[in-house]
Amino acid sequence: NLNESRADLGFIASLPGRKILLRGNHDMFWDAKKTRLLNELYKGKLFFLQNNYFTYEDPSRNVHALVGTKGYCYEGKDTPEHFQKIVKREQERLRISFESAAADGYEHFIMFLHYPPTSIGEMESCFTRMAEEYGAELVVYSHCHGEARYQDSFLGEVNGVDYRLVSADYLNFRPEKIME
């Protein structure tokens, strides 16, 4: 729960730099109803990315909207009905992020997902189609752990979108610079 997470969130907030958090599959303290509260509690220190967007300006003064959601991919554990229910929910959350940013005039997007953008063996998904529809320049994702899983989804450019895996073990626990 949130009370149990306060010490960890406080530690992360105390670290230097901007911290934008995206919900993962183990983040039980955070549900969609708490996003606004979390952003109020940690204003200026942490930003919780869900059903919203974050503005990023690079050194060349290009402005991007950072959008994202947890996402979901099929790993063989779900019934088709349960899988589709979760994907539909996550797709809607991502659309809310894109639409909010677009309504505020943003044209450049960086998309974040916790899960890979496709299930194993898929050549597209609702998430990749949405990245293409809104013109996301980059999709950053994680969740793939262990060498056997690193190739589960896209790496590099596909249909004009750059896909980057940033799972900690894939990066040898070193931060990845994704933009200037």
Regions found by a protein language model. Give the residues of each.
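Core catalytic region of metal-dependent phosphoesterases/phosphodiesterases
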Residues: 1-59, 123-136, 159-167
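Short, charged, surface-exposed secondary-structure boundary motifs
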Residues: 30-32, 140, 172-177
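Short, solvent-exposed loop/turn segments at secondary-structure junctions
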Residues: 3, 118-121, 148
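N-terminal active-site segment of His-dependent metallophosphoesterases
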Residues: 1-17, 27-28, 77, 93-107, ...
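Short, Asp-centered acidic motifs that coordinate Mg2+ and/or phosphate
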Residues: 20, 108-110, 138
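Active-site glycine-centered loops adjacent to acidic/histidine catalytic or metal-binding residues
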Residues: 24-25, 114, 142-143
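Binuclear metal-dependent phosphoesterase catalytic core
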Residues: 56-60, 85, 132-134, 146-180
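Conserved catalytic scaffold of divalent metal-dependent phosphoesterases
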Residues: 32-122, 130
